[in-house]
Every structure is written in C-alpha cells, then in structure tokens.
UniProtKB/Swiss-Prot annotation:
InterPro entries: AsaB-like. Belongs to the asaB hydroxylase/desaturase family. Residues 1-23, 126-150 are annotated as: Disordered. The keyword ATP-binding does not apply. Residues 126-138 have a biased composition (Acidic residues). Keywords: Oxidoreductase. GO terms for molecular function: oxidoreductase activity. The gene is chry3. Its EC number is 1.-.-.-. This is Oxidoreductase chry3. Pathway: Pigment biosynthesis. PANTHER family: BLL6449 PROTEIN, OXIDOREDUCTASE AN1597. Oxidoreductase; part of the gene cluster that mediates the biosynthesis of the yellow pigment chrysogine. Pyruvic acid and anthranilic acid are likely substrates for the nonribosomal peptide synthetase chry1/NRPS14, with pyruvic acid adenylated by the first A domain and anthranilic acid by the second. If pyruvic acid and anthranilic acid are merged and released from chry1/NRPS14 by hydrolysis, a subsequent amidation would lead to 2-pyruvoylaminobenzamide. This process is probably catalyzed by the amidotransferase chry2 using glutamine as amino donor.
Length: 379
C-alpha cells in the first residue's frame, strides 16, 4: 500500500476585499502589513519536478509569468563560501554577470541589465509594519567601502542592515509602472531601453493611450523585467510562491501607487512621461511615482483560481524566474473574468507572488536566506 502524499498548503495575506490601500511614502515599500488583513490557507503545486526540464518545462514565462531552473553559481564552489554572498565585490564581478547570461539563456533576449539586488537574512517581525515586501528593500547595505552610489544597488548584505521577507501578495509593477520604471529608474536602464521608449513615445504622441499600448506591441521592441530568486541555504520556512497569470482573475488585481528612486541624469527625451505635465518636476525629489498591483483573495469555491506554486525545500541551485512585466506577453495575454467566464481587457505581463507561511512549518527554524536580482531584458 502506498502512502498518499500530503498536499502542500500555505497561508497568504491579501487585502481585505473592497479596501483601498494607503500607499507608502517611502521608496520601494508597499503599504503596511496591517492592510493585508485577509489571511487565507490555499493549496500549492510543487515546481520541483520541473527544475531539470529546461525549455521543456510546462511553466512558461509567456503564459504563467514564471518558470524554474536548476542553475549553479561559481560562488557555490571553493574558494567561495556562504560569506561570499555578502561580498559586494564578488556579487558584482561574478554573480551579476552570471545572472545576465542566465536570463539571456532562458529568455533568448539580446541584452540583460542587472538593476538591483536584495539579500535577505532576517526573520519577519509581526510588529514591523514597515517591513518590505518580497521584492523590496528597506535599507541600503553597509560595508567597509562606501558603495551606496554604485549601480546596481545592493540591499541587505550585512547583518546590521539585514532585510526580511514579508507576506504581502503583490506584483511589483503594473504595465504603466513598468514603463515608468524604464524611463525614470536609472540611466543604464533607460539607455538600454532607448528604442523601446522612443517607439512607445511615438505611439503616445499620435494619440494612443498608455493603457492601449498593449494593442500595438508589434510596433515596439520587446522588453521585460525579471526577478531572479534563489535561496542561500535550504528553505525550511517562509518560502516564496508564484501565482499563475493564466488564471488570476481581473477582479483580484488592485493597483496601488508606489515610490521608486529616480535618476535625474537620464536624458530628457527618455525621462519624460508623454501626456503628463513634467515642467514642474522637483529636481531635488529623489523618487518618482510608479504603480504596483496588490490583490484580493480568491472567491472561487475551490480556492484554486490563483494557482499558487513554489519549490519544496528549495536549494541554492533551485532558481525561480519571476516575470514582473513583459510587453510581448501583455500584447496577447488577458486576465480572465472571475469564474473563468471569458477574458477581460486587462493585459497581463507578470506573475503575482508573495512570501508565505507553510502550514506546519517549523517556527523555530532559522530565518530564510535568499538573494534576489532584478533584471531588465531587451530583445
């Protein structure tokens, strides 16, 4: 007699349905955890069987908004150790180039630009209302060398300035947020995106609305934003889960304004937002307004419409590829109506995700340790 496998389940924190979140005034931060008051236990699918399938994986970036791969780093082998992942010089010289090549191999893009990294090594504190969400950082890491001015920024790479996961179901950028990001975040990203921005601006100046750019994707070069996420030791608590964009209903997306750092050295023809009066921009303001998605909990009877996935006991070589936005996917993918009764007009280009609490996880286990690298990709 075979023993049935115990189903995977996790507890997720959503906005209370009908509530409108209060945006954080701080760069990167999502609203306070107190606003995520709807705690729901939901089923999960394990991605582990797909790790070695490569391009044959059933999880497709242009369908689900995520995939998973097995990938080793040079930092996993001697003479390097766990401490090497807190060494900014090694991350910049070894790991970031590895990630850029990895993204090229997985997606086929021609250029990949690492834009930020976050190392997490702290337990989440229930009382920390300003704790950052899964793809956020609450502080610039300190080190013996002043690297705060360097690009890409690295957050949380010291014990003193550690960053923790926080269970807030979200997607880091709406389509408009992604387009503002490539224009306003940093000159290296904006310059890499120059052809994209110029093509979109021509459409916008011809009268196309921002929300209708999805209907003109064939006239704009392909670009995407990714988060490449791996643990630094086996994950026993507070894993990261991904929700399938193919089934996440339009009624559960909640747009929310957010702040990001800005770079005033970006050339003006790339920095400007067509259709907005930017003449009175405060050049002393170090942030700009962008937009993310938060979410309401699923309402279907089986609670499966969000189709959550994770990697059980995720190892350092088990890598999650999280698509935050892809303009080519947005050109054809539409969020389904609730109950699967057809498609809405909302273009989707990425996967909602969150740190979560595994049912029956060991609450005495050490803090999860992970590194996330943000990448802008261009074809």
């Amino acid at each position: 007699m075979t023993t049935a496998t115990k189903p995977h389940q996790g507890r997720f924190r959503y906005l209370t349905r009908g509530s409108q979140p209060t945006p954080s005034k701080e760069a990167y931060l999502l609203p306070s955890l107190s606003e995520f008051g709807d705690i729901v236990t939901l089923p999960l699918t394990d991605l582990r069987p797909s790790l070695d399938l490569g391009q044959d994986s059933p999880y497709k970036l242009d369908v689900h908004g995520f995939t998973a791969r097995r990938h080793d780093s040079a930092l996993h082998s001697a003479p390097y150790s766990r401490a090497s992942w807190n060494n900014e010089k090694l991350l910049r010289q070894i790991y970031f180039p590895e990630v850029e090549e990895f993204v090229k191999n997985v997606t086929g893009c021609k250029k990949a630009v690492v834009s930020a990294a976050v190392v997490r090594n702290r337990l989440y504190s229930e009382g920390d209302d300003s704790a950052p969400a899964e793809e956020e950082a609450d502080t610039q890491a300190s080190s013996s060398d002043d690297t705060s001015h360097m690009f890409p920024p690295i957050f949380g790479n010291s014990v003193k300035d550690g960053v923790c996961p926080a269970p807030k179901v979200h997607l880091d950028c709406t389509p408009k947020g992604a387009r503002h990001h490539i224009r306003r975040y940093h000159s290296e990203v904006a310059l890499a995106a120059e052809k994209v921005i110029e093509a979109e601006n021509r459409l916008l100046e011809s009268g196309v609305e921002w929300n209708d750019l999805k209907d003109h994707s064939g006239k704009v070069p392909h670009f995407a934003l990714f988060s490449i996420w791996r643990p630094l030791k086996t994950v026993h608590r507070d894993p990261l889960a991904l929700s399938s964009a193919a089934s996440f209903p339009v009624s559960d997306y909640v747009p929310c304004d957010q702040r990001e750092p800005t770079d005033h050295s970006i050339p003006s023809h790339l920095y400007r937002i067509v259709g907005r009066d930017d003449e009175n921009i405060d050049k002393n303001d170090d942030t700009y307004q962008t937009q993310s998605y938060l979410a309401y909990a699923p309402r279907d009877a089986e609670k499966t419409s969000h189709a959550w996935h994770y990697i059980s006991e995720q190892q350092p070589s088990d890598v999650l590829v999280i698509q935050l936005f892809d303009n080519e996917m947005e050109g054809h993918a539409r969020a389904p109506l609730e109950g699967g009764k057809g498609k809405s007009d909302l273009g989707v280009g990425g996967a909602v995700h969150s740190a979560f609490e595994l049912v029956d996880q060991d609450e005495d286990a050490e803090a999860r340790e992970s590194i996330e690298v943000r990448v802008a990709a261009f074809w």
